[in-house]
């Protein structure tokens, strides 16, 4: 019995050794200039794109997040992972806020691994320093049977839907009904439509102001032109009056000269007659 037990123990040990040898570790790769620091292959593999999470990509959601507004950077380190996880799994991203800030966020997301097929919609607003991001990965068609999930992504964020808010890591199915989602989407669209209408009204006011300014300039030019024409006419009239005055003066002088000449001739005749009568 002891011999049989020893044989069984030896066989068991041999099996363990063989199984351990069959699961040997993968060969390591030595990096340049670091010959004494082995690195596993998995740590240096490069991917052409960031893979999607199997659960999150199939979970319909719609999230409204208030993004921070820092002067020197966009996101804190603790916010980067969750924000990019949300952006990367979205099909549509709407950014509302300051025009320069929302453009910075769009370029930042696209330059740091966000999928190229994500549709970005930028809605600039006035007097709003922060940025609101609305991210969704579901079809808002009323016939869509999928129920969107809401998440509390960042601390201080405001979920867009009021039904059973879940954490982004939970992947729990929300109890939000499709009708509520449609109503929320309709309200957001109405808000965006108000923003668009505001900008249209602002543009119309600017155009009206420009038209009024051009009309005022035209009226001023016409007034100046009329004044210049009036002044020219006055100058012409004054010139004519002066000219006519000179002509009248010359005519009067000529008349006086003629009268003087006539007086001299008459005086000469009278003297001749007196001489004849006196017999001289």
Swiss-Prot record:
Main location per the UniProt record: membrane
Q: Where is the signal peptide?
A: 1-20
- Keyword S-adenosyl-L-methionine applies: no
What keyword terms does UniProt attach to this protein?
Answer: Cell membrane, Lipoprotein, Membrane, Palmitate, Signal
Q: Name one GO cellular component term.
A: plasma membrane
Q: What Pfam families does its record include?
A: Cag12
Lipid moiety (N-palmitoyl cysteine) attached at: 21
For this protein, the record's PROSITE patterns field holds: PROKAR_LIPOPROTEIN
Bilayer topology annotation: Lipid-anchor
- Renumbered to this chain, the positions carrying a covalent lipid of the kind S-diacylglycerol cysteine are 21
- Where found, per UniProt? Cell membrane
Name it. Answer: CAG pathogenicity island protein 12
What is the protein's species of origin? Helicobacter pylori (strain J99 / ATCC 700824) (Campylobacter pylori J99)
Its gene name is: cagT
